[in-house]
Amino acid sequence: MESFAFAYKLKNNNQNNKVPHTHEAECHINVWKVDVGTILPKTKLYFDFGLMINSNIEWIYAYIPFDFEENGRDFDLVKKLQNNNQLLCTVFNCDYRIQMGQGDTFGKVMDKEDNIKFSLHQLGSTKFEIIPFYKTGSKKDIVGKLLKIHIQEVPQDTEKVYIRFRIEPLKTTDIVKSEHISNDFLQAAFSRIDMYDLRINEIRNINTDVMDKIKGDNYIPFKFDKVHLFYMADTKENVANGSSLKQDSRLLEKDLWATYLPENCYKRNYIAHHWKKRVKKEDMRIIEESIIETKQLFIPFDDYRIFFTTVYPNIQIVRLFVYLCIVVLLGWCGSMLSFRLSNFLPHSIPECFKLLIVAGMFFVIIVFMIVTSYHLIIKLIRK
């Protein structure tokens, strides 16, 4: 899959200033894999994007490398955070409270000491525009969409602004590579493996038309000081990390996340698998002779990439039917090859000799099982 891309443009009164290209953003991405519906539930993917940006940014480009729908009421997640203070604290894992101002557009988020941490910014239908990008030589096949987001004038005492929105991919095949488990003949009928390779601001994997649009409109790709990615899935799903980033997992609290889940989502236990990227650097300074002070600094980085696989229950009726056909055919072949021992042995051989032949076969099978399981038997005896 192509890379996601996030870029920004400063306010007009800041464009001519010599502002370094280091307006770092903090990026949050939640990937939800949920079952929607009651009688015949259907598995769907949802992507939540959150950006913590400087207040002197006026425009944001967010390129999504697949076709999606904005999801109507569920698009702007800031509304959910403004209406539920407990949910706000849960999402940011801090003890915050919100103070509304300037209508419903902004809400100041404050800590216990009443210090303003940042402002939540709602995204109404007039605050963003969707620009589709098509496959080369086609005017129907959409390969991605560019969200052009307008940040309104923020309160003067606010340094940081936070936006958060949710989208639903129209086709999951554009994002996930799915295969059956090829190294296990039987398990392949009951399980499936999905592969996710998600990238953010990886220049060489961004659509060239999108990069031309970003550069042509004088937007600057974000640098990041921190990126969080969460993959929310059913407890029966096994996630394997394929990245150098550390993975940690926890069980989501049903009562805290109930109002945040996608609409019509089947309520069940979900596990949040988390990957965080933050680049550290040690700064060493000599204070006096033989005295060195070491300070740990966090430096901005350009891109983010994560790869992981998931294995989950998935009964494949066609594959099971094929397996059943194989068993029936083998039984039919066996019955065709069956014969009576009397067809080959003279009738003078007593029945007890035939019994010895059958017993010998069982003896060979038992010996074979013991020999092949020798190491396992030794371990059991030692225990």
Model regions and ranges:
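Surface-exposed, acidic/Ser/Thr-rich flexible loop segments
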Residues: 72, 147-250
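N-terminal pre-first-transmembrane soluble regions of secretory-pathway and organelle membrane proteins
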Residues: 1-163, 372, 376, 382
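A composition-biased, non-transmembrane "mature-region" signal
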Residues: 1, 237-239, 252, 257-261
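A surface-exposed beta-strand-loop module
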Residues: 115-186, 266-292
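Hydrophobic, helix-forming membrane-interacting segments
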Residues: 312-383
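Cytosolic-side membrane-insertion boundary helix
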Residues: 262-334, 338-342
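Beta-strand elements of well-folded, non-transmembrane domains
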Residues: 51-55, 68-70, 167-173, 233-235, ...
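Ordered hydrophobic segments in well-structured contexts
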Residues: 5-7, 44-50, 61-63, 148, ...
